[in-house]
Amino acid sequence: MNILTFGPNGSGKGTQGSLVKKKYNLAHIESGAIFREHIGGGTELGMKAKGYIDKGELVPDEITIPMILETLKAKGGNGWLLDGFPRNMVQAEKLWEALQKEGMKLDYVIEILLDRQIAKDRIMGRRLCANDPNHPNNIFIDAIKPNGDKCRVCGGDLKTRSDDQDEDAINKRHDIYYDTNTGTLAAAYFYKKLAGEGKTKYIELEGAGSIDSIKETLLSQLD
């Protein structure tokens, strides 16, 4: 089973992806990690990418997509779940073409729907436990709301990440994601159109629900 996921930062996309990965024993492949692995490993593609990154430039799709395909083939023997790519319409088209050329099927595309303001609130509401960063706390999500200013799990002190409080940075990321003309949602709709043609399956999930309710709905729609 091969899956592509879409959802704004704050939608719980990573959480649901991890749950699906565990249930179906998929390789959870995140685009940022691919860059780190290739650069850290000193691969030819990684060094080319590093040259652009060091100059503060975007890595061209002609480098990024081969890196992704190489990783999918190397780690996705039992299936894969790709997170964080494509981020725009052009990348969506190029990735689809590359998958077709390699004979790699795309079984499902998952989109988690979430209002932009709710997504922003969730990001800014994140709190990190000083004892264990894996203890989820968020002042805007009832199920994981902290106990006052203490961790809901262990009672430890809480802190915030500086980038979670940077409204300008959050808005810029969301400007790209919610752009239905050329941005990430345009990419998602490209695959939705393919699903309408029977070339893949498209699952839409309402992200405002609880983690468990979203999980149940998602798993019920996966074969």
UniProtKB/Swiss-Prot annotation:
Pathway it works in: Purine metabolism; AMP biosynthesis via salvage pathway; AMP from ADP: step 1/1
Keywords from the UniProt entry: ATP-binding, Cytoplasm, Kinase, Nucleotide biosynthesis, Nucleotide-binding, Transferase
Residue ranges of the region described as LID: 125-164
Domain of life: Bacteria
One record GO biological process: AMP salvage
Residues that bind ATP: G10, S11, G12, K13, G14, T15, R126, G209
Pfam family for this entry, one: ADK
Residues reported in the UniProt entry to bind AMP: S31, R36, E57, L58, V59, G84, F85, P86, R87, Q91, R161, R173
Ranges for region NMP: 30-59
Catalyzed chemical reaction(s): AMP + ATP = 2 ADP
Keyword tRNA processing recorded: no
Assigned EC number: 2.7.4.3
GO CC annotation, single: cytoplasm
Keyword ATP-binding: yes
Family: Belongs to the adenylate kinase family.
Physiological role: Catalyzes the reversible transfer of the terminal phosphate group between ATP and AMP. Plays an important role in cellular energy homeostasis and in adenine nucleotide metabolism.
PANTHER family attached to this UniProt entry: NUCLEOTIDE KINASE (PTHR23359)
Subunit details: Monomer.
Name of the protein in question: Adenylate kinase
Source organism per UniProt: Solidesulfovibrio magneticus (strain ATCC 700980 / DSM 13731 / RS-1)
Gene it is expressed from: adk
